[in-house]
Each structure stands twice: as C-alpha cells, then as structure tokens.
C-alpha cells in the first residue's frame, strides 16, 4: 500500500535544496539554481521524489542519477505526469523567494559598503619615500619581530611616536625598569624603520636608547643603536655626532677592531680632533698602544659624558695587562694601597676581589702586599680569559 505523505516534498529534499542554494551563492554561480530546479523536476516527473536519499545527495550525484534514469526510460512509453510548472513547483516558497532576493540585495549593499570602507581605510603612503603611514594611537607597544608586511593599524605614526618617547623618558627616570624600557624602545625603533622615518627625531631615539643601554651594560643593544646612528649621521642628519664618535673609538678599543679603527682614524676631520670627548678617546687609544697604564687609568677616571661606561667594558682586561707589566718591573712586592690607586679602583673591596679572581700570590709575612714574580704566571693565565671579546653582550 502506497504510503501517504502530508507534504509534497520530503524534509531531506528541502535540506538538499538549501545546501545547493548556499553553494551557488557562496561560489557566485546563480545558474546552478536553475540546474538544481531542472534536475529535481525530472525526479518529480519520474515519481522518485520520495525514493531518493536526499540526505546523502549532492549536485554531482544528482546529475549522474538523473542521466542514468533518462537512459533507462528513453525508449519506454509511459504516461508522464503533467510537468510541474513554475507556479506548481519551486525550490523555495514565494516568501522564501522574497527573502532570498532581500538577502542578495543586502549582500550587494554590504559588498559595496565594505569596498567603500576599504577605500576609506586605504593605506596612507608617504609620498617622499613610498613607506606606509601608521594609524595606531597606542603609546606603549610590545616589541615583536616582523614575520610579514607591517599592519598600519599596529604601527604608530610620527606624532604618536614623539609622545611615546616622552613617556619612556619619564618612566625610565622614575622606574629604571630596563627590561621594559628596552622592549619599548625596540618597538619604537621598529615603527620608525617600517615607516622609513629618518630625521632628527630618529637620531634622538637612537641616541637615548644607546645611552640607556650603555648605563646598563647592554653591549649588544648599544652596538645596534650605534650602527644605526652612524648610518643616519652619514645622511647629514644632525645629532650628537662628536659624542658618539668618541664612543665609537672606545668601542673599537674594546672589540680590538684594528682595521675599522685605522679606517676611522684616516677619515677623521681636524674639527673632530678639537672636540674634548674625541680627544679623550684618542688619548686612551694612544695610552693603550704605548703601554702607558698610568695615563690610561688617569683617563679612565676623567672620561667625559658616558665614556667611562664604555671603558668599564675593558677596564679589567687593561688592569690585568698592567699587572703583567708591573710584575716584570717591580720586585719583590707592592702594597695593595699602591696597586689600588695605580689601577684606579675606587673601593678597596673591589681591588681585593680583582686580585682574588686572578689568584694573585700574597706575601705570607705581610698579607697587604702582592708578590710580583710569583704572581706573573697567574696574571698571564688570567689574561687568556680576555683573548676573545664577547661583542654580543646582550642581557
């Protein structure tokens, strides 16, 4: 007995139609709707509407099924039910058809609106260098290495970066949190770089970060700033060029980079040599070259600006070298007080720790004296630790 159905269309068919319509809309192929309508009409004509497993059907399998059935009945004569007209059969009800048109209209409007928004939020480009111009207004931003093209929404433009610098200067003065400050300065520098901002403000940022890094002994970060500064200076951008030229000379003494030092000296201008900081750095170089440790340690105590911080990087090495020379020049021993003054120690405790780290030999009769001959090999062994310079130095 034929099963009666209250609805002319199975629920699974309605779901199948919905899937097909969605696919057609997502793939922008409205002609697929007409094909689905035609294929389902053929199944209706053949009386198969309730026999097909619509839940597992897709458009391709429906095509194959319909084609196979058409082949089977091609030569058979049978009474064909009245074809379904557009009014009798529709993939959607009239209300659904209206909803569908409304959705299409809205999608078109949304598409147009999104295109307009895209145009209104088009990348702003600096006409001078072709770089992007950031849109972010955040004063603080963590530093993250770029793995793709910079997003203007996360990049701060120059006016915001100037506010950021003032905030960082204030926070450094009040909090002295180097980990935070270094991260923020690197983020600031990154925003300058991606926007190709190379001006006096850029120089100021790198100079301030370089000084802070020096103060905290972060050689790696200082060197990055120093390298970029001389790149900016080469464009004629004004800054504290003489101050950082002096630092560069001292840094080369630390790294023992003789080739670069010779190149720098060959390109020095007469006006550079008249600057107090540059003159001091050149005198330090001369004292080291001639082995004049008396002069060297005097210059260490009177280093201008932040030159003392740079000399701190290699002061222990020069103290060991000076002790090797004194061990050969003095016999039999020297007092701790004399050595502390000669080697420019400000605290006797630091002097004691220095000789202890080098395993210096003390006079058993007078613990306040260092035996020169007996300590020679100890200082020479200690000097080997300074043979390789760690120019990375990041903390």
UniProtKB/Swiss-Prot annotation:
Residue span, PCI domain: 218-384
Domain of life: Eukaryota
Keywords: Cytoplasm, Nucleus, Transcription
Protein localization: Cytoplasm; Nucleus
GO CC, alphabetical: cytosol; nucleus
Main location: cytoplasm
UniProt-listed InterPro entries: PCI_dom, SAC3/GANP/THP3, SAC3/GANP/THP3_conserved
Pfam family, one: SAC3_GANP
Region listing for Disordered, in residue ranges: 91-127
Family per similarity comment: Belongs to the THP3 family.
Function, as annotated: Required for transcription elongation. May also be involved in pre-mRNA splicing.
Protein name: THP3 homolog C2A9.11c
Species of the source: Schizosaccharomyces pombe (strain 972 / ATCC 24843)
């Amino acid at each position: 007995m034929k099963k009666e159905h209250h609805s002319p269309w199975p629920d699974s068919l309605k779901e199948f139609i919905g899937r097909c319509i969605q696919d057609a809309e997502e793939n922008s192929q409205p002609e697929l709707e007409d094909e689905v309508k035609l294929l389902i009409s053929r199944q209706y004509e053949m009386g198969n509407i309730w026999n097909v497993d619509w839940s597992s059907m897709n458009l391709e399998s429906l095509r194959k099924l319909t084609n196979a059935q058409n082949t089977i009945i091609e030569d058979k004569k049978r009474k064909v039910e009245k074809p379904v007209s557009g009014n009798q059969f529709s993939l959607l009800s009239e209300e659904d058809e209206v909803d569908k048109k409304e959705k299409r209209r809205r999608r078109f409007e949304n598409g147009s609106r999104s295109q307009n928004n895209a145009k209104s939020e088009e990348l702003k480009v600096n006409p001078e260098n072709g770089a992007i111009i950031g849109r972010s207004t955040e004063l603080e931003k963590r530093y993250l290495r770029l793995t793709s093209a910079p997003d203007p929404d996360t990049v701060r433009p120059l006016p915001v970066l100037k506010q950021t610098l003032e905030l960082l200067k204030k926070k450094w003065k009040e909090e002295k949190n180097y980990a935070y400050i270094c991260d923020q300065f690197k983020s600031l520098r990154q925003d300058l770089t991606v926007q190709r901002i190379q001006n006096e403000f850029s120089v100021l940022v790198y100079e301030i970060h370089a000084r802070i890094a020096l103060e905290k002994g972060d050689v790696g970060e200082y060197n990055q700033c120093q390298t970029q500064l001389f790149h900016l200076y080469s464009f004629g951008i004004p800054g504290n060029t003489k101050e950082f030229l002096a630092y560069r000379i001292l840094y080369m003494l630390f790294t023992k980079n003789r080739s670069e030092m010779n190149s720098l000296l060959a390109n020095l201008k007469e006006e550079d040599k008249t600057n107090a900081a540059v003159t001091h750095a050149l005198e330090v170089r001369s004292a080291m070259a001639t082995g004049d440790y008396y002069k060297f340690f005097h210059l260490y105590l009177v280093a201008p600006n932040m030159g003392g911080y740079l000399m701190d990087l290699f002061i222990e090495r020069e103290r060991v070298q000076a002790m090797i020379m004194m061990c050969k020049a003095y016999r039999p021993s020297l007092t701790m007080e004399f050595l502390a003054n000669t080697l420019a120690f400000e605290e006797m405790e630091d002097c004691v720790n220095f000789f202890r780290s080098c395993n210096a030999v003390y006079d058993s009769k007078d613990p306040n004296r260092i035996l020169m001959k007996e300590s020679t090999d100890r200082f020479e062994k200690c000097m080997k630790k300074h043979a390789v310079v760690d120019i990375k130095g990041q903390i």
